[in-house]
Amino acid sequence: MKEIKVIIAGPRGRMGHEAVLLMERTEHFNLVAAVDYKHGGEKISDLPGMPALDAPIYADLHTCLEEVEADVLLDLTTPEVGKQHVTLAVERGLRSVIGTTGFTEEELKQLTEIAKEKAVGTIIAPNFAIGAVLMMKFSQMAAKYFQDVEVIELHHDQKLDAPSGTAVKTVELIRQNRESKQQGHPNEVEQLEGARGANVDGIHIHSVRLPGLIAHQEVMFGGDGQMLTVRHDSFNRASFMSGVKLSIETVMNLDHLVYGLENIID
């Protein structure tokens, strides 16, 4: 396969560290630079626990793109920074794979239009774990037969957004096969605000944040005399790398924005 030159934004994070290791062990990936506001002017090999890669680190993406030629930006930063990075990348015609979440429908619409206008491939993935993507697809299928459903998502206590992008995407897919309806007793009352979780078109999402967790989600469907549970667990961040690899390879052949890995796997 032809070499793909990659810039990683957010190499110091846990996902970023795994992505750097992915670059090292994948023959056709070439890490040409990284973006980290705390370590501009250093090299990847200067960071604790990193492999001996000489890719330079830039304090900001704008300067990096002025000095480095790349094929793909892999952004694994925070939601706010990720939004800025993908906008800059798309406007400059650089393909990007975005692993941050928190995009609104309006923001996705704007990015989709810009990507189409620039004919630049972009993938925004709420979850890179292939198993999690299958969980979402299975949940979408089940919703045709089970109209009553609730989602419980569980993540580490350092996660910034709630509910997770995976939970939101799961509900979006379920809604495609489910008529809008309110679940539970029509006169139910929350004795404590938020007790029933977030409500999206009658589907409740419950967010759990605890140390020791990585990324987990349970989709519970209830029916007369039966229950169906679809669950996925990521026990470490290596579970996300197969999806990162697939996304980087796939975005090279796209000329538009794709939201969600379920749209690029067969």
From Swiss-Prot:
Catalytic activities: (S)-2,3,4,5-tetrahydrodipicolinate + NAD(+) + H2O = (2S,4S)-4-hydroxy-2,3,4,5-tetrahydrodipicolinate + NADH + H(+); (S)-2,3,4,5-tetrahydrodipicolinate + NADP(+) + H2O = (2S,4S)-4-hydroxy-2,3,4,5-tetrahydrodipicolinate + NADPH + H(+)
Binding site for NAD(+): G10, P11, R12, G13, R14, M15, G99, T100, T101, A125, P126, N127, F128
GO biological process, alphabetically ordered: diaminopimelate biosynthetic process; lysine biosynthetic process via diaminopimelate
Chain sites annotated for binding NADP(+): K38
Active site: H155, K159
Classification via InterPro entries: DapB_C, DapB_N, DapB_N_CS, DHDPR_bac, NAD(P)-bd_dom_sf
EC numbers, comma separated: 1.17.1.8
One GO cellular component term: cytosol
Family the entry assigns: Belongs to the DapB family.
Name of the featured protein: 4-hydroxy-tetrahydrodipicolinate reductase
Lineage of origin: Bacteria, Bacillati, Bacillota, Bacilli, Bacillales
